[in-house]
Every structure is written in C-alpha cells, then in structure tokens.
Amino acid sequence: MVSEALPFGQTSVTAVELRSHVDAAAATEALVAADVDHARERFDAVLETVPELLEWLSVHGREYPWRYTTDPWRVFATEILLQRTRGDAVAEIYNPFFSAFPTPNAVREADEADLRDLVRSLGFVNHRVRTLREAADLCVVENEGQVPTDLEALQRPWRVGPYTARACLLFAFQEPLALVDANTARITERVFGYPLPEQPHKSEAVYRFLDALVPDEPALARAFNLALLDLGALRCTNSNPDCSACPIQPSCLYGSVGEGLGVD
Ligand code: SF4
C-alpha cells in the first residue's frame, strides 16, 4: 500500500526490478519519434540511475504535510493551492485551511470572506477562490461529495489543467501517471536531449514518453514523480543546475557533456 510508505512511496528498488515496471518499448519509440539520438542506449542508461534518484529522494525529498495523506479532497484542494505558488507558502496555511474546510461541502458552505482570508497569503485570491468553489461544486453536485476519479472530470473547474488532475489521480488514487510541469519538462530535456515543444504540459508526445517511463507500480510511480519534482526544485534548477550533486548525473546528457560521458 502506498499509504504505508508515505511520504515518498517506494524509494528502494534495483534497476532490474524497475525495468519490469516500465514500458521500455513505448518509451524508446517515443524518444525515436521525438528525434532523440541513441534513444535506446539513452533510455537504458537513465533507467540504471533511477534507483539512485529514488534513494536521493528518501534523504533529500521535501516533507510537505500533503505528502503524508492520500485523502482525495486534501490532495485535490492542495494541488489547487499550489498552482503558481511556492510549496513553503502553502505549507504555512495547510493546517488552518483543512481545519476550516475538511470537505468539499465545507468550501461550498463557507463565507466568501473566510475563504478569501485563508488563501490571501498565497496571492491570486480571486483565481484561487473561484477554482476551489468550482472544485467543491464538482465533488458535491456532480459526484455525491467525492472527488472524481476521472481525468476529464477533474479538469472541469476553472483553470484546472492536466497537471492538477493527474497529480490528484497519482497521489490520491494511486494511478501511475506522469506529471508534466516546468521542472519535469526541463529534466526530460536535459537528461535525454529531448526537444521540448512550446507547451510540454499540453503535448501528447511528451505524455506518451513520460507515462511509459513512470513505473506501473503505484508506490514507485509516486516516488518517481516526487523525485523529479524535487530534483527540479533542488538540483536541476532552471538557471543553475547543480550537476555535481545530482544522483542521475552519470546518465544525463546535459550533465555529462563537460566530462565526456555522453552517449556517442
Ligand atoms: S546532471 Fe545536471 S542537468 Fe542533468 S538532471 Fe542532474 S542537475 Fe539536471
């Protein structure tokens, strides 16, 4: 059970075990379709370093409070609070928010002023309140008070896109799906030499590749996605990647170029 392995899921695995949980053929095919050089060799090399990546997560991963729950409403609402917002800011209001609004119905019945006061520190207050209200309506009016388990339905509230919907399915309902945001897209580009499209989070090709790379075992899928998110935030940053302290540096095209370790 994933819940027994919170906050990060399964962080200990061998490369051989991992290989039985990914769709290597589909992933390689997606790399070839994207014109990635030496697709199979690159995929194999990266897969060998994923166990180190998960081990790194177990030591350096960020232990946010929402990583200790699989409660669907907490997961869904938290992902809305995290939109365009730092995790540390959301962590500060996490307990007061869910004390006040432990269910979707509590948000539906809340005074506008109370809801606004609780999310004010995060900014984008109008956006946030509207999305939370619509998410609560979705659960209560359309789904008997429960968070939907359908990718399309989860994207019905205003400004809820594939990232938030997929994160909900992954973290609450243990569906082994890939998350595509700026961090995971940047790592994909650097590690594989993957030529990113203009909007990676809307690209079917990017999802096809990363969904094939995400392990089909839920606890591993959780760990793999969290590892990419945290690696992007803590090591593989946009402007200053810290390759010397990165667990997948030996297999990363970008990180190994300077040391002549790239696949020829
Ligand atoms: S080696 Fe460098 S570029 Fe590659 S994933 Fe790690 S931090 Fe990013």
Predicted segments with their positions:
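Intrinsically disordered, low-complexity, compositionally biased regions/tails
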Residues: 13, 262-264
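Catalytic cores of DNA base-excision repair glycosylases
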Residues: 38, 43, 52-262
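Intrinsically disordered, low-complexity N-terminal extensions of nucleic-acid-metabolism proteins
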Residues: 1-18
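Extended substrate/cofactor- or partner-recognition/assembly subdomains adjacent to catalytic sites
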Residues: 47
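Short, contiguous pre-domain boundary segments
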Residues: 14-43
